[in-house]
From Swiss-Prot:
This is O-antigen polymerase. The chain crosses the membrane at residues 15-31, 46-65, 74-90, 107-123, 148-164, 201-217, 220-236, 239-255, 258-274, 317-335, 342-358, 361-377, 399-418, 421-437. Polymerase involved in the biosynthesis of the B-band lipopolysaccharide (LPS). Catalyzes the polymerization of the O-antigen repeat units on the periplasmic face of the inner membrane, leading to the formation of the lipid-linked O-antigen molecule. Pathway: Bacterial outer membrane biogenesis; LPS O-antigen biosynthesis. The keyword Cell inner membrane applies. It comes from Pseudomonas aeruginosa (strain ATCC 15692 / DSM 22644 / CIP 104116 / JCM 14847 / LMG 12228 / 1C / PRS 101 / PAO1).
Length: 438
């Protein structure tokens, strides 16, 4: 084990690109996107003399945390946190009607910066590889078992939702409302459907792409279709797209340059602006960039207001609160929708840093960030030491979940803990101690 801290030309290039990306985020928000969500509280970002020096320093810190390329699971997680979470939390902070005076050195922006810094530093720990690669036969047997369990759960979901199952685009929100009753959060149906699909299919699909095995490819697509028909979820299709591109690229080159990821997102921002200028409306802005950057930045402003009004929640909405005799209250995401947006049916999903801040302030953020950091170390260890390539899609699954859910929900309800356990089982040489004994 060793710690890598290296600065080269790629870091300088990424600093420039991240600065351009952050600056473009402010420009696009103020001129093209914020008005698409102003009915919920989004606003223009205040631009003053100190903004651009701040963005340059922020870009340098983010470039140092990301490094030059995505080579390991932890690199993927940190890079996605930087290019998705930083823009709406530390660049567009204050671009809302709930906390217009929010600064990066206070409140939820500071909590998020603190958490990303912890995870980014932990990710600098490196491990020397061993001669033996991942146990192929052991891994294949586990994948077959997962695929069988996944198919059983898909059949279960289909029959439970048969009364309203549909691929109709207009009825997606109605299906979501019905699914909340049929597959209620915290119920056996809810846990089974969530873990049996959303935890399994990214790994199965990734294996199919990487090994060119059509069965797992088709199974991943079937999962996305079932989740769309039963739950009205578009998220699985985005995950399939990301996994396919990532696995194909990794299969060919073995790494992804961070500069290319930043350039791709920068081009999306500019394409959205160009589409608006040419057609007077941008589908890209409305259906992708608004959801990726403007909606979460507005919700984080609401988080700051919530904490200032109600203080810390002390995990009263979790099983921990029930075990401590406090009683289990309404989930924070729904309480945020009720108290700040006056909509009791609104599930105001925010990232796990923000949830931890609402639960226990900076102490909660530090504790949960260390848990995520520990998971990063485990995935990096298995990947570097034992060649556990499946840690890459697990890291992608982990990241996409913590961007909009609490850590406890991600680990247990979304099955990430189970996938980490599965990853360890197919990676560690389980028969080593038995062989030595004999």
């Amino acid at each position: 084990m060793y710690i890598l801290a290296r600065v080269d030309r790629s870091i300088l290039l990424n600093t420039v690109l991240l600065f351009a990306f952050f600056s473009a985020t402010v420009w696009v928000n103020n001129n093209y996107i914020y008005h698409l969500y102003d009915y919920m509280g989004s606003a223009k970002k205040t631009v003053d003399f100190g903004l651009y020096p701040y963005l340059m320093v922020l870009a340098l810190i983010c470039a140092l945390l990301c490094g030059g390329a995505i080579r390991r699971p932890g690199d993927l997680l940190v890079t996605l946190l930087v290019v998705i979470l930083v823009p709406h939390s530390l660049v567009l902070n204050g671009a809302n009607q709930y906390s217009p005076d929010a600064q990066p050195w206070a409140g939820v922006p500071l909590a998020i910066a603190f958490g990303i810094l912890i995870i980014g530093i932990v990710n600098k720990i490196r491990f020397h590889p061993l001669g033996a690669l991942q146990r192929e036969n052991q891994g294949r047997r586990m994948l077959v078992l997962l695929s069988v369990l996944n198919i059983v759960v898909l059949v279960f979901i289909f029959f439970k939702s048969a009364g309203y199952f549909s691929f109709d685009f207009a009825g997606q929100y109605a299906r979501r409302a019905l699914a909340r009753e049929v597959f209620a959060a915290g119920s056996a149906n809810g846990y089974l459907s969530s873990i049996g699909t959303q935890a399994f299919f990214p790994v199965l699909f990734a294996w199919g792409v990487y090994r060119r095995q059509w069965f797992y490819l088709v199974l991943g697509i079937v999962n996305a279709l079932v989740l769309w028909g039963a739950f009205g979820q578009k998220y699985p299709f985005v995950v399939l797209f990301l996994i396919y591109g990532l696995m194909v690229y990794f299969r060919r080159f073995g790494q992804v340059r961070v500069s290319w990821v930043v350039c791709a997102l920068l081009m999306l921002l500019l394409l959205g602006a160009l589409e608006h200028e040419v057609f007077g409306y941008s589908f890209l802005n409305d259906y992708f960039l608004r959801r990726a950057f403007i909606v979460p930045s507005t919700l984080l402003g609401a988080v700051d207001q919530f904490v200032s009004q109600f203080g810390s929640n002390y995990y009263r909405d979790t099983l921990l609160g029930a075990l401590l005799g406090q009683g289990r209250t309404e989930p924070l995401s729904f309480r945020l929708g009720t108290e700040i947006f006056n909509n009791p049916d609104m599930n105001a999903n925010v990232n796990f840093f923000a949830i931890a801040y609402m639960q226990l302030g900076y102490v909660g953020v530090m504790a949960e960030s260390m848990l995520v950091g520990g998971s990063v170390v485990l995935m990096n260890f298995l990947f570097s030491r034992y060649g556990a390539f499946m840690a890459i899609p697990v890291a992608l699954l982990f990241t996409t979940k913590i961007l909009e859910q609490s850590l406890l929900t991600v680990m247990l309800g979304s099955g990430v803990f189970l996938m980490l356990l599965f990853l360890a089982l197919i990676s560690f040489p389980l028969k080593m101690s038995l062989g030595k004994t004999l």
